[in-house]
Curated annotation (Swiss-Prot):
Gene Ontology biological-process entries: sterol biosynthetic process
Lineage of the species this protein comes from: Eukaryota, Viridiplantae, Streptophyta, Embryophyta, Tracheophyta
Entry-linked PANTHER family: 3-BETA-HYDROXYSTEROID-DELTA(8),DELTA(7)-ISOMERASE, STEROL ISOMERASE
Gene that specifies this protein: MOI1
Name of the protein in its database record: Protoglabretal synthase MOI1
Role: Isomerase involved in the biosynthesis of glabretanes triterpene natural products such as glabretal, a component with in vitro antiproliferative properties on lymphocytes. Catalyzes the conversion of 7,8-epoxymelianol to protoglabretal via skeletal rearrangements.
Length: 211
């Protein structure tokens, strides 16, 4: 597989420092959310982990992806702006971000404006054990899966040639984006099984009453 030269922009921060600060920020969000989830109505560790996932993904959608959507000139920003630097670094794996390709701009717009707030609401729903939490998490996970598949598919249809090297292709484009395939798929499967079980119990109860 050949790859285009991509977008190798001069960065104010080293790649290692960007990954370190980004990683620390994400871990801090997870840690704080985990502590808070312990004071919630969540009934199991899995539900507490789900609260962490929805809080983390919601904040990423709203702030990180929202920054990309609503800052059209971020790639011209030469100041040591951490958020802009993150996107400049990621564009090494997908140069469509640097050119603000309509496909990624559309996907990121939906993610930041719609899926971000809904993900945060999902975290609240699990924490408060709301009756709609199963169907809500299932629906948002399907939407995330759809967006990620669309992201991969649009690149494939245009030649899948947007990374500056194989390293960035597999570590950034494939590796990071695959998280939004694997986790939503696991959550969607979990709640499909739970919703199906509830529907079956209701159906069996109805049949018993009729009989």
């Amino acid at each position: 597989m050949s790859h285009s030269s991509g977008t190798d922009m001069a960065l104010n921060f080293s790649t290692a420092s960007l990954h370190a600060w980004n990683g620390v920020s994400l871990l801090l969000i997870i840690f704080v959310t985990w502590i808070i989830s312990g004071m919630s109505q969540a009934k199991s560790k899995i539900e507490r982990l789900l609260i962490c996932w929805w809080a983390l993904t919601g904040l990423i959608h709203v702030f990180q992806e929202g920054y990309y959507v609503f800052t059209p000139d971020l790639f011209n920003d030469n100041s040591p702006n951490f958020m802009a630097e993150i996107w400049k670094e990621y564009s090494k794996g997908d140069s469509r971000y640097a050119t603000r390709h309509t496909s990624v701009l559309g996907i990121e717009s939906v993610a930041s404006i719609v899926l971000g707030p809904l993900s945060l609401l999902a975290a609240y729903a699990v924490a408060k054990q709301k009756s709609y939490r199963y169907i809500f998490q299932f629906a948002i996970s399907i939407a995330q899966l759809y967006g990620t598949i669309q992201y991969f598919l649009t690149a494939f249809l245009e030649g899948d040639n947007f990374a500056s090297s194989r390293y960035y292709y597999y570590s950034y484009y494939v590796g990071q984006s695959s998280i939004w395939v694997i986790v939503p798929m696991l959550i969607a499967t979990r709640y499909w099984i739970k919703i199906h079980a509830i529907c079956k119990r209701l159906q069996d109860k109805k049949v018993t009453k009729v009989g």
